[in-house]
C-alpha cells in the first residue's frame, strides 16, 4: 500500500479533558425544527405534551448535553414574554429573520420541559438586537430566581415552581451580520454586551456568558470584531462564540474535504486574537471558545430564498431542509476531529441544528423520523469522544487539491477514557482514490486489544438516506485493525470515516 500515515500516542501526551458540551446542538424557531419537529400534537408518536417520542429517542441516541435556544437570527426580534403563560393567550407574531409566522405555542417553559426529556441543558440566547439590558435581566430573573420577585413569581404563576437554573447565556446572536435585526458595530455591541453581562451577573453570579464573535471567517470585520468587542467584554464573559458552515458549492469533492483545514485556521486565529486581548489587558484569565453553530449548509439555499421572498408568513414552512449525502458526513466527521484537537480552548460547540433544519434528524409529518448521513459521525464522537484528547505525533502522505494546495490523506485524533481504560482513534481518509495504511504506536497502553473498528464508507459520495432507505450507515470492520507489539495497523479505505476502539 503506497499511501501511509503514522501516529504516535502516549497517555501522557495530552491536549485537554474534553468538555462534553462540545457535543451540543441547537434548536431555533425556524422551519420545522419546533413545529412538526420536536413538537407535533396528534401525531401517533406524540406524548401528552405533544412531543414526538420517536424524535426524543433519536436525540437521546446522540446524547446531546446542551442545546442552544431559541436562536439564531430568530432571537434578535424575540419577545420572550410572548412565549410564556397560557397558550391560548399568547400572541402570533411576524418572525422577521425568516419571514415566518410564530404562533408561540411552544415557548420557554415547554422547551425546558422537552430538554429535560432528552437529558440536555438549555443554552439560552437573549435578544440584543431589538431589545437590551433590562429585558435580558427580566428573562434571567424569570428563569433562575427562586421566588418573591415580579418575574420569578410570574414563572410560578405559569405553573413552574422551581427555577430553570439555566447556566449558559448567549449575549445576542451574530451581531456583526448586516442581516441581523438590530445589527451593531463593534463598539456598539462591545459596550452593550459589557453592560448586559455586568447586570446579569448581579442577578446570578453563577451563570456563564458567551459574547458574540464573528458570524464566519469571511466577514470583513473578522478578526477586528473579536479584538474590539473583547476589549469591552473580556472581564465579564467566559466564552466568545464562533459560527461556520461549509458546502461543496463547486462540486469538487476533493477540495470540499479540505475545508476542515479552514476550520482549524479559523479556531487558531480566534485563539490568537483572544490571547492578544489577554496580553493587552495584562489579564490572568484565558478566554475559551463556544463554536455554537457549525455544520454543512448549502443544499437548500435556493428553495429557502423562494420561500422567504415569494411565500412569506407561513407557520413552520419547510426551510433549510438540507438532505445530506455521504461526503457531507465525511466533512462533519472532519469538523468533529478539528473540535477535539482544540479541546483545550473549545469548551462548547453546537451542531446546527438538531431536527429538520440542517439537521441529523428528519421527520415526516405523516410518518416516522429518520437518521441523515451526518447523524452517525456525530453519534460516534458523542459516544466515544468523552475523556482526554491526546496530542498525536502524526506524519503521512498528502494529495493535491484545487484551492488548498496539498493536504494530508488522513486526519485523526485520539481520545483516552481513563475510567473505562479505553482509547478511541477517530480517523478520516479523505483521499478519494486510494486506501491508506495507518500505523499507530500505542505502546503506553499496555495490555490493550482491538475492541472494534467501525467504518462508514460508500462508493457513491452523493448517496443519501431517506425515511424509507438508509444507504449510508456504519458497519463493523474489525479485521481492518491488527494490534501487535504495541503497534496498531489499520486499513483506512478511500473516503471513509473510521472509529477504532482499543481497550482491555
Per-range role (PLM):
Residues 1-225, 231-239, 263-264, 268-302, ...:
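Non-catalytic accessory regions flanking glycosidase/transglycosidase catalytic cores in CAZymes
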Residues 243-259:
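Active-site His/acidic residue clusters
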Amino acid at each position: 500500500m503506497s499511501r501511509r500515515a503514522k501516529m504516535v500516542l502516549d497517555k501522557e501526551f495530552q491536549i485537554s479533558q474534553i468538555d462534553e458540551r462540545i457535543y451540543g446542538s441547537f434548536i431555533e424557531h425556524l422551519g420545522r425544527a419546533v413545529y412538526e419537529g420536536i413538537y407535533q400534537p396528534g401525531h401517533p408518536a406524540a406524548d401528552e405534551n405533544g412531543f414526538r417520542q420517536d424524535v426524543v429517542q433519536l436525540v437521546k441516541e446522540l446524547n446531546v448535553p446542551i442545546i442552544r435556544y431559541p436562536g439564531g437570527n430568530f432571537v434578535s426580534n424575540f419577545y420572550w414574554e410572548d412565549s410564556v403563560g397560557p397558550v391560548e393567550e399568547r400572541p402570533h407574531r411576524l418572525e422577521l429573520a425568516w419571514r415566518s409566522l410564530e404562533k408561540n405555542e411552544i415557548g420557554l417553559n415547554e422547551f425546558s420541559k422537552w430538554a429535560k426529556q432528552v437529558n440536555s441543558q438549555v443554552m439560552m440566547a437573549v435578544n440584543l438586537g431589538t431589545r437590551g439590558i433590562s429585558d435580558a435581566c427580566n428573562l434571567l430573573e424569570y428563569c433562575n430566581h427562586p421566588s418573591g420577585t415580579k418575574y420569578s413569581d410570574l414563572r410560578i404563576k405559569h405553573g413552574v415552581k422551581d427555577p430553570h437554573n439555566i447556566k449558559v447565556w448567549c449575549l445576542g446572536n451574530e451581531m456583526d451580520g448586516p442581516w441581523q435585526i438590530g445589527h451593531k458595530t463593534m463598539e456598539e455591541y462591545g459596550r452593550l454586551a459589557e453592560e448586559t453581562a455586568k447586570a446579569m451577573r448581579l442577578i446570578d453570579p453563577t451563570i456563564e456568558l458567551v459574547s458574540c464573535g464573528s458570524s464566519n471567517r469571511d466577514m470583513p470585520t473578522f478578526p477586528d470584531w473579536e479584538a474590539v468587542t473583547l476589549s469591552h467584554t473580556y472581564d465579564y464573559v467566559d466564552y466568545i462564540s464562533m459560527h461556520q458552515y461549509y458546502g461543496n458549492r463547486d462540486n469538487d469533492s476533493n477540495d470540499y474535504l479540505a475545508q476542515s483545514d479552514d476550520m482549524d485556521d479559523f479556531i487558531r486565529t480566534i485563539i490568537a486574537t483572544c490571547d492578544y486581548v489577554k496580553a493587552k489587558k495584562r489579564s490572568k484569565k484565558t478566554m475559551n471558545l463556544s463554536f455554537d453553530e457549525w455544520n454543512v449548509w448549502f443544499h437548500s439555499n435556493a428553495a429557502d430564498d423562494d420561500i422567504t421572498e415569494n411565500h412569506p408568513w407561513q407557520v413552520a414552512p419547510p426551510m433549510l431542509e438540507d438532505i445530506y449525502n455521504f461526503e457531507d458526513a465525511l466533512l462533519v466527521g472532519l469538523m468533529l476531529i478539528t473540535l477535539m484537537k482544540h479541546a483545550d480552548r473549545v469548551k462548547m460547540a453546537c451542531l446546527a441544528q438538531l431536527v429538520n433544519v440542517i439537521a441529523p434528524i428528519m421527520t415526516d409529518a405523516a410518518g416516522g423520523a429518520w437518521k441523515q448521513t451526518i447523524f452517525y459521525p456525530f453519534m460516534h464522537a458523542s459516544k466515544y469522544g468523552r475523556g482526554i484528547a491526546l496530542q498525536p505525533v502524526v506524519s503521512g502522505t498528502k494529495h493535491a487539491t484545487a484551492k488548498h494546495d496539498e493536504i494530508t490523506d488522513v486526519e485523526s485524533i485520539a481520545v483516552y477514557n481513563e475510567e473505562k481504560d479505553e482509547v478511541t482513534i477517530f480517523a478520516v481518509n479523505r483521499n478519494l482514490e486510494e486506501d491508506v495504511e495507518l500505523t499507530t504506536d500505542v505502546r503506553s497502553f499496555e495490555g490493550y486489544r482491538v475492541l472494534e473498528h467501525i467504518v462508514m464508507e460508500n462508493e457513491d459520495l452523493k448517496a443519501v438516506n431517506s425515511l424509507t432507505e438508509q444507504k449510508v450507515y456504519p458497519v463493523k470492520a474489525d479485521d481492518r485493525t491488527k494490534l501487535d507489539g504495541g503497534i496498531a495497523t489499520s486499513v483506512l479505505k478511500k473516503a471513509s470515516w473510521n472509529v477504532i476502539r482499543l481497550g482491555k
